[in-house]
Amino acid sequence: MAELVIGLPRIERAVDMLSESIEPLLKSYGSLALPLPKSLCTDLVVEGIGGSEQSIEALSLKYYNPSLVRIWWSVIKKIPRLALEHPDSEIICYDEDTRPEKLEKASYRLASLLIRARLKIYERIDPRPWIEFFKPTSTGSIEIPETPVVIADGYVRFKEILGTASWKKAEKIWKLIPTPLELLEMIAKGYLEEKHAEEAVRFSVRYLGDYVIGSRDLTEAYEKLLNDKEYLDLLRRIDPNIARDLNPKIGRARTV
């Protein structure tokens, strides 16, 4: 049973806040699980200890594309040092290994969907290709290690872990809501009714085409989403509980 499950949005600011908490969590609980590729953690411990930041980045790029490395960099670069300084503690990565080439291919598919949708922005959008994009490629679920602390990135993963694992306490870092893309993922997985699909696609187009492309990083794009009254109204229509914690103090975890 996990003593603590922590959920955070997949953005730079939230990961930086998590990075500041990892060492205290290790000292308090002894081990924790991170949503990073399994082999990345192994490589960071076996090959990363004593290496430069450039060598650690090169190891990371074996499993992540540059944008994901940027998001997780403050945590990734700490793992070799923590493994050296806390030999009796354990950091386990539980996500499946994915090659950067596969991530890039998915990015191209998503960009293609975005371009086609923007050309039809004033017409009825067919959400089926978007739902198909987010359908799981395997029937099995990710195996969560039996560690005292489990970190979950993204709203969907946080809720999946809370729904399948045994846990005592759950907290959120910063403000955690599903992005429009996660709404589509929830529809594809059967967690959300398909009647919300067309609105989810329209907000996905806005999120990607206006917020992500027009921002310096994902943190800024996410902040724009948090201030999008239309989108927040959609979330409240879907489930009033989703947007209930939109104003926590920055830097503090919130108990679910």
Mark where each language-model region is.
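Compositional signal for N-terminal targeting/processing segments
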Residues: 1-256
